[in-house]
C-alpha cells in the first residue's frame, strides 16, 4: 500500500483542511500519480529514487520519492520515514526503463522538531549503505524568498513515482509535470488562517491546476531553475476542502522550502562523519568537494 494523501485538521496552525501523506489511512479516491504528467528522462534526472518501507505499527507498506543530493544521501519528507526502521527501508533507482538497482539504508535522519500531526519540519535524510553506480550528477539545492518578490512566480518541475491515472504503475515509473510556483501568505494561503509559528517557514505552493502530486510522490523534488527548491509535502483545496482528488482544477500542492532548512541539511551531513565543503552564495547550497568515509 502506498502512502496516500489524507484530509486532516492541522491543529497548531491551520483551520482549513489540507491533505498530507499519512501511513495510517488509505484514501482510495486518489488513483493517480503526478496528475496529467509525463514520463521523465532517467538520464536527465539520474538523482531520482523511490523507496519502500514497512510500518509495522500499522502493518502497512508505504512508498515515497526522494532525491540523491550526494552519493550517500537521499533527501525526502519526514512523514515518509516516520516510525520506520532503517532495516525495513529499501531505496530503488532506475538505470534505464528496464532495469533498476537497490540499496539498503544505514541511517535515518529525521528532523528533530518534526511534528507528524501538524506537518511541521517535514524533512528527512536517508544515508544509504553504498552509492549507486553510474550516477552522472546529483541535484544541487538553491532558492531564496527574494526570487518571489513582487508577486513573482517561477516555472518549476515536480517529479514523483507511484500510480498513474491510466494504470496501477506496478513498475513504479517516474512522472513529471510543469508547475507555476508561488511563495507568500497572500499567494499561497489567502483562504487559510495561519499562526505566526507556521508563517515563519512558509512553504512554496503551486497555482491551482489539474497538474499536481498524488500518492507516491511525497518527498519528491520541486526543481526550479535546475535546482532543488522544495520537497513535496501536502495538497489542499481552498475552494472545496472535501475535494482532494488528484486532477481537481482547484487543487494546490505545497512544498517544504529548502531555503529554511539549508543549515539543518549541511549540519546533519557533517555530523555523520562525512566531510563536505559548501559554497553559500545567495544561500545557494552547492557541493564543491566531497570526501566520504565508507567505514
Residues covered by each model-derived region:
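Active-site region of chymotrypsin-like
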Residues: 44-62, 133-138, 183-218, 229-231, ...
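Protease-domain processing segments flanking chymotrypsin-fold serine proteases, especially trypsin-like
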Residues: 2-75, 84, 90-92, 189, ...
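Conserved catalytic-core segment of clan PA serine endopeptidases
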Residues: 31-43, 88-134, 144-146, 163-165, ...
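Extracellular/periplasmic catalytic domains that process cell-envelope and extracellular macromolecules
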Residues: 40-44, 68, 82, 116-120, ...
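Chymotrypsin/trypsin-fold serine protease catalytic domain
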Residues: 123-129, 134-207
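Acidic glycine-/aspartate-rich tracts in secreted/extracellular proteins
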Residues: 79-82, 94-96, 129-134, 162-165, ...
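Disulfide-rich extracellular modules and peptides
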Residues: 82, 158-160, 190, 207, ...
Amino acid at each position: 500500500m502506498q502512502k496516500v494523501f489524507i484530509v486532516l485538521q492541522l491543529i497548531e496552525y491551520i483551520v482549513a483542511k489540507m491533505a498530507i501523506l499519512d501511513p495510517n489511512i488509505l484514501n482510495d479516491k486518489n488513483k493517480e500519480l503526478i496528475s496529467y504528467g509525463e514520463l521523465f528522462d532517467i538520464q536527465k534526472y539520474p538523482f531520482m529514487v523511490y523507496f519502500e518501507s514497512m510500518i509495522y505499527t500499522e502493518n502497512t507498506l508505504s512508498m515515497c520519492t526522494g532525491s540523491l543530493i550526494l552519493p550517500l544521501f537521499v533527501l525526502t519528507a519526514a512523514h515518509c520515514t516516520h516510525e520506520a526502521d532503517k532495516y525495513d527501508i529499501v531505496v530503488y533507482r532506475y538505470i534505464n526503463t528496464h532495469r533498476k538497482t537497490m540499496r539498503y539504508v544505514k541511517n535515518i535522519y529525521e528532523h528533530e522538531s518534526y511534528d507528524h500531526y501538524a506537518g511541521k519540519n517535514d524533512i528527512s535524510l536517508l544515508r544509504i549503505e553504498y552509492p549507486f553506480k553510474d550516477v552522472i550528477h546529483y541535484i544541487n539545492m538553491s532558492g531564496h524568498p527574494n526570487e518571489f518578490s513582487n508577486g513573482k512566480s517561477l516555472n518549476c518541475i515536480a517529479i514523483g513515482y507511484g500510480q498513474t491515472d491510466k494504470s496501477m504503475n506496478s513498475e513504479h515509473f517516474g512522472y513529471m509535470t510543469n508547475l507555476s510556483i508561488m511563495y507568500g501568505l497572500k499567494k499561497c494561503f489567502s483562504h487559510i488562517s495561519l499562526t505566526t509559528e507556521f508563517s515563519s517557514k512558509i512553504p512554496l505552493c503551486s497555482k491551482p491546476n489539474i497538474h499536481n502530486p498524488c500518492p507516491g510522490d511525497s518527498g519528491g523534488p520541486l526543481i526550479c531553475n535546475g535546482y532543488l527548491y522544495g520537497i513535496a509535502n501536502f495538497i489542499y483545496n481552498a475552494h472545496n476542502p472535501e475535494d482532494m482528488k488528484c486532477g481537481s482544477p482547484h487543487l494546490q500542492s505545497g512544498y517544504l522550502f529548502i531555503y529554511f532548512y539549508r543549515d539543518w541539511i549541511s549540519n546533519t551531513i557533517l555530523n555523520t562523519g562525512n566531510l563536505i565543503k559548501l559554497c553559500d552564495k545567495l544561500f545557494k547550497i552547492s557541493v564543491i568537494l566531497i570526501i566520504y568515509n565508507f567505514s
